[in-house]
Structure formats: C-alpha cells, structure tokens
C-alpha cells in the first residue's frame, strides 16, 4: 500500500509500485 499520497505520511512513505 502506498501512503505517499495519503496525509499524514506514516514516516517513510511506502510506495507499492
């Protein structure tokens, strides 16, 4: 799951690309 676009970011955003 990518949380880079979801504020707030839980520390280092994990982008599941």
From Swiss-Prot:
Location in or out of the cell: Secreted
Listed GO CC annotations: extracellular region
Function: Serine protease inhibitor that inhibits plasma kallikrein (Ki=1.7 nM), and plasmin (Ki=33.0 nM).
BPTI/Kunitz inhibitor domain boundaries: 4-17
Tissue-by-tissue expression: Expressed by the venom gland.
Organism: Oxyuranus microlepidotus (Inland taipan)
Superkingdom of the source species: Eukaryota
Lineage: Eukaryota, Metazoa, Chordata, Craniata, Vertebrata
Site feature (Reactive bond for trypsin) residues: 14-15
Record's keyword terms, sorted: Disulfide bond, Protease inhibitor, Secreted, Serine protease inhibitor, Toxin
Family note: Belongs to the venom Kunitz-type family.
Any one GO molecular-function label of the UniProt entry: toxin activity
Name the record gives this protein: Kunitz-type serine protease inhibitor OMI
